[in-house]
Amino acid sequence: MSNFIRRLVGKMKAISTGTNAIVSKKDSIYANWSKEQLIRRITELENANKPHSEKFQHIEDNKKRKISQEEVTRSKAKKAPKKFDFSKHNTRFIALRFAYLGWNYNGLAVQKEYTPLPTVEGTILEAMNKCKLVPSMVLQDYKFSRCGRTDKGVSAMNQVISLEVRSNLTDEEQRDPTNDSREIPYVHVLNQLLPDDIRISAVCLRPPPNFDARFSCVHRHYKYIFNGKNLNIEKMSKAASYFVGERDFRNFCKLDGSKQITNFKRTIISSKILPLSETFYCFDLVGSAFLWHQVRCMMAILFLVGQSLEVPEIVLRLTDIEKTPQRPVYEMANDIPLLLYDCKFPEMDWQEPTVDDYKAIKFTTATEALTLHYELKAAVCNIFKDVLPTANTNNFSKTIINLGDGRGKVVGTYVKLEDRSVMEPVEVVNAKYSKKKNNKNK
């Protein structure tokens, strides 16, 4: 509404209320107009203003249409890229060898449920999915298999997985090794996407027929690193030797009812205590297959022997199911010092990055930097330890059971394994799980 019309409306109000309005010279011609005359004049003026208002409205509408069109154009520009169609690409079955430091991960195997830390496999498969080597995170989609599962905190140096991945070559071209240089550089591509504590070390482009990373493995080689301070290494070596051969290891593992395992016999090929330096040793263990937490349980018993809390022959007693049908209650050794050192397979053609390749040098430098990072932290920790007062533990009356983590477990009076309470037998654990599963499915 224009100022002029507002003045006319004000005049109308003055007339209707009978008040004496102060009128300007510009408005004096309307002083004696009646209410009806003023209304007619207002109507005339409003009608005269309409074309002007419609003109501006038309301009405003055009602006809105232009903005709307620009938004549509931008939306098209930001449109999601076309979905990658795996059916239009060749695939091939390969094996990958890799190493990882386990303390930043929630174990090797990818999990269906949420985990507080990422898993090693999950990290690798996410990298593969990102660069379109695999179509999804569903393992069954590409014949996935792993050699040896490792738990949270445990590392591996020569872990192996086998799976089907995208390829640049046809089936016929894949059979000819002269075409390998035209293949996707799997090691380089993945290492560019993976964190520094997971590294692909080699690829086998043509695994043996019917190869499976789990079932084709001949044996697995573990190492458990420990500080030899206050331990009788000779006794530990004797106890370790008793593990060799086929033995029942139900008292050296964590029972898992979901697996419904009834055969706990496993073959140990080699079991030794080896020196690494003046301070550190390793429990060096080679076997065909292992049970859940088996190595950590074996190491826990070796620590008890090394502290002279148990005799070396306790190994023979615990592997004799007639004498010890149920596992005594004891704590496993710490997870961090354990590593899956190697996985032995039939002869395979592993292709490693060439040492003079720029990318290989780049990844080697990153690994050296990571190693230096931990060495510097260790050096700082040693200085930290040296500047702090040291307590005299010689008069400490309680026993500290060595678990490999430097802290151990404090107990008032040590109870021999043969005198401890025992865990439920295998048959009960399996039956409980089966009953629970059946009730859930009803």
Curated annotation (Swiss-Prot):
Reactions performed catalytically: uridine(38/39) in tRNA = pseudouridine(38/39) in tRNA
BP terms from Gene Ontology: mRNA pseudouridine synthesis; tRNA pseudouridine synthesis
Active site location: 151 (nucleophile)
CC terms in the record's Gene Ontology section: cytoplasm; nucleus
UniProtKB keywords: Isomerase, Nucleus, tRNA processing
Principal EC category: isomerase
Enzyme Commission number(s): 5.4.99.45
Pfam families attached to this UniProt entry: PseudoU_synth_1
Localization: Nucleus
SUPFAM superfamilies associated with the record: Pseudouridine synthase
Primary localisation category: nucleus
GO function term, MF aspect, one: RNA binding
Binding site residues for substrate: 222
Domain of life: Eukaryota
Family per similarity comment: Belongs to the tRNA pseudouridine synthase TruA family.
Function: Formation of pseudouridines at positions 38 and 39 in the anticodon stem and loop of transfer RNAs.
Further comment: Present with 5860 molecules/cell in log phase SD medium.
Protein name, per record: tRNA pseudouridine(38/39) synthase
Lineage summary: Eukaryota, Fungi, Dikarya, Ascomycota, Saccharomycotina
Name of the gene encoding the protein in the UniProt record: DEG1
